[in-house]
């Protein structure tokens, strides 16, 4: 499915032409922990809404030579902007964002996907993490001074 058409006649020798589809795919980062995490061999894509499971499989196997085992798709409804959020009886929809199509692509068993690191960690972020760790340590030391103060029976009785 392409919007480009081949011309009937072109000057010169006949040439092979490849027409790629007008579809697009984008890798979506999924959480590595928690209930929404995906298996290691699964990749989450946001795809063109016109794409079918077969289109996604062919796109990844033919163009990128990936070992696709299974494709599952999901259509997520776009957010609706209401004129009045609290008035449930008379509210009207003012705007609706476009729906998204999400594809979960499962690769063969040995394949592992990790989301690429696009940017290096900033020094400010590293300093912030270091300060947070230091704050936790100080909090623990402060709590140790006050923990179980009323249970110093040994000191009280002279033992």
Curated annotation (Swiss-Prot):
InterPro entries named in the record: Nucleotide-bd_a/b_plait_sf, Ribosomal_uL23-like, Ribosomal_uL23/eL15/eS24_sf
A Gene Ontology BP annotation from the UniProt entry: mitochondrial translation
GO cellular component, one term: mitochondrial large ribosomal subunit
Subcellular location field: Mitochondrion
A molecular function GO annotation: structural constituent of ribosome
Keywords, comma-separated and alphabetical: Mitochondrion, Ribonucleoprotein, Ribosomal protein
Family: Belongs to the universal ribosomal protein uL23 family.
PANTHER family hit by this protein: LARGE RIBOSOMAL SUBUNIT PROTEIN UL23M, RIBOSOMAL PROTEIN L23-RELATED
Subunit (UniProt): Component of the mitochondrial ribosome large subunit (39S) which comprises a 16S rRNA and about 50 distinct proteins.
Protein name: Large ribosomal subunit protein uL23m
Organism for this UniProt entry: Caenorhabditis elegans
